Amino acid sequence: NLESVGPANKFKPGQKFAQQPAIPGQAESPGYSYTQCGGAATYCIFPNDIIEVGCLWTHDGDSYFESSVAEPMCCVICGYKTNYHVKDRYEHVMGTKKGGSIAILGGCGPMGLGAVSYALAIENKPAKVIVTDIDDAKLERANQVISVEEAKEKGVELIYVNTAKMNNQVEELKALSVDGKGFDDVFVYVPVRGVAELGNKILAYDGCMNLFAGPTDSKFSADVNLYDCHYNATKILGSTGGNIDDMKEDIDRAARKEIKPAVMITHVGGIDSIVDTTKNLPDIPGGKKLLSLAY
């Protein structure tokens, strides 16, 4: 909560707040660029440059954790809005295709599950969402937190599939799409060459593939079908981060229970666990780690 405020009338003590770390026009972030704001601080002072650009706002949700994972969820939202399709050859229609087929490759991690949750909430809902992984345990957990029955109630056919058990991944995945010819929107949630190439191969006509997972190798590349790019209007792009509007949308949808940010979280800890968790993060399996800064 906000503990105290200055003479301005925009904020009031006691309000829940959310904060966008990607400040427009600067590289510095409230993560670790400020001396009195960010990091693992129990209390902090928000400087003017964060407030004046609209990166601090209040929300009416009934929990605190939902705003704490608003940044990764806003990245997911940005990904959906970055995809586009073409109408009448020249008009770009932004967003995923309504009533189409979405494939979320490597989608049983925290970000992928956030993408599944968002697909069930958007106004231009797809008809089918196919989520892939190569780990049965992760696929089982994914179905526990976002079940195929829940998706059906929201008008979407959701299928979890282990591609490691497929003899012909391309053809078997295409067969799961609405018309059996491929996917209108493909999201690649792991920076693996083979997965990216698979995503390119399962695109339908006018399909759009989003390399959502950010590679750390600056020479990361993959073979793509440029014939399909020319004759079948396929598109490949990438998205990273999100903007203020994306984060506000996440906060609002979470408050209305339209999306489930909790699906991203697998570990919960207190302030005393911050140091060890941060130092050993690469060795801790699972999804997001929610660490409370309260005493």
Can you name each region flagged by the protein language model?
Residues 1-23, 38, 50:
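Glycine-rich beta-strand-centered segment in the early N-terminal region that forms part
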Residues 7-13, 75, 98, 205:
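Short, flexible surface segments
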Residues 14-18, 102, 209:
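Generic structural signal for buried aliphatic residues
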Residues 20-100:
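NAD(P)H dinucleotide-binding glycine-rich loop of Rossmann-like/cofactor-binding domains
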Residues 63, 74, 108-111, 193-194:
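Residue-level detector of alpha-helix initiation sites
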Residues 87, 166-171, 194-201, 205, ...:
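C-terminal hydrophobic helical "lid"/dimerization subdomain
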Residues 98-101, 105-108, 116-195:
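Adenosine-nucleotide cofactor-binding segment
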Residues 143-153, 190-256, 293-295:
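Glycine-rich phosphate-binding loop and adjacent beta-alpha segment
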